[in-house]
Amino acid sequence: MKFTLISSCVALAAMTLAVEAAPNGKKINIPLAKNNSYKPSAKNALNKALAKYNRRKVGSGGITTEASGSVPMVDYENDVEYYGEVTVGTPGIKLKLDFDTGSSDMWFASTLCSSCSNSHTKYDPKKSSTYAADGRTWSISYGDGSSASGILATDNVNLGGLLIKKQTIELAKRESSAFATDVIDGLLGLGFNTITTVRGVKTPVDNLISQGLISRPIFGVYLGKQSNGGGGEYIFGGYDSSKFKGSLTTVPIDNSEGFWGVTVKSTKIGGTTVSASFDAILDTGTTLLLLPDDVAAKVARSYGASDNGDGTYSITCDTSKLQPLVFTLGSSTFEVPSDSLIFEKDGNKCIAGFAAGGDLAILGDVFLKNNYVVFNQEVPEVQIAPVAN
């Protein structure tokens, strides 16, 4: 099901009790409305993820620090995609951006783009007094043929009440139809700066740190389930301990390729180990749980799921017959419960929330909406705990 904005933002004066009040700390609640015309597609979600990492289609041959900022997330398309509102320019224009730990660029539609959808909010450089041209260009292309390109510039960016000055932004002058049909206006990358399209560009998190806007180089991520009201929240410079239960487990990060890479030590179903260790990427910009082909096949067999020949699996629609999928990271285990194992319902047929990713493994939103993650860019490491009920 598809969800869209139905009312203006409402700013709260202070953080929740679990998150100490902080200068510029704000929360914004955004009610959601349901669009019954939307039909989720696991196949499309899988292909989008594989294209992002330039892989071929499978089968085709709390407490915060003194300074923090909070950005609420809209749960769009029934946990398919999450976006937050970011204000860019002076005076500011609000853009719906995909907060993506699997990439590092900040780009969005602009009035310079004739191919960008009119349904998108477009940033107009002529209307911002703090806009400055950069002179460089950028271009992104993916394995499925989708692409976007444009120019670099700098402007002020307001991220959850934290004002980043002279943030490098990428203005789209052209985008393919795959981007034009998306509800979001662009993307805000939260990966490491070694994978920015134009080398040497500082990411928004880099600038939050270097400009002293946050006193710790961390951000906490909570992706709400639609069954629990949807939404979600990013907190920059801290985290919200009311959003998780128990204590946080520290997991080291391998960022040698610019991603938030972790080692999954084991995978279990009902106490039975179904796979040994494998490396995976924590990616808020990927909907599904992608597993290496051999792991996906073993998980599917354990659930009695059938291979659809395109990387996805058909699975029983009866959640009472499904046991949680359990991953070991660091010294703890983290679950994907039975209700999250079903991604798409089509009559009597259900499509699983996990898929075969070739040699690629991604702990996407299917995992992240069940587990709170604090990303620490400086160490680097993450801390993970199960979300509170």
Curated annotation (Swiss-Prot):
Cysteine pairs bridged by disulfides in the record: C113-C116, C317-C350
Enzyme Commission number(s) from the entry: 3.4.23.21
Top-level class of the enzyme under EC nomenclature: hydrolase
Family classification: Belongs to the peptidase A1 family.
Keywords from the UniProt entry: Aspartyl protease, Disulfide bond, Hydrolase, Protease, Signal, Zymogen
Residue span(s) of the pro-peptide: 22-66
Gene Ontology biological process: proteolysis
Phylogenetic placement of the source organism: Eukaryota, Fungi, Fungi incertae sedis, Mucoromycota, Mucoromycotina
Domain Peptidase A1: 82-385
Signal peptide: 1-21
Annotated catalytic residues: D100, D283
Catalytic reaction list: Hydrolysis of proteins with broad specificity similar to that of pepsin A, preferring hydrophobic residues at P1 and P1'. Clots milk and activates trypsinogen. Does not cleave 4-Gln-|-His-5, but does cleave 10-His-|-Leu-11 and 12-Val-|-Glu-13 in B chain of insulin
Name of protein: Rhizopuspepsin-1
GO molecular-function term, one example from the UniProt record: aspartic-type endopeptidase activity
Source species, domain of life: Eukaryota
Pfam family membership, one: Asp
PROSITE patterns on file: ASP_PROTEASE (PS00141), PEPTIDASE_A1 (PS51767)
UniProt cross-references to InterPro entries, sorted A to Z: Aspartic_peptidase_A1, Aspartic_peptidase_AS, PEPTIDASE_A1, Peptidase_aspartic_dom_sf
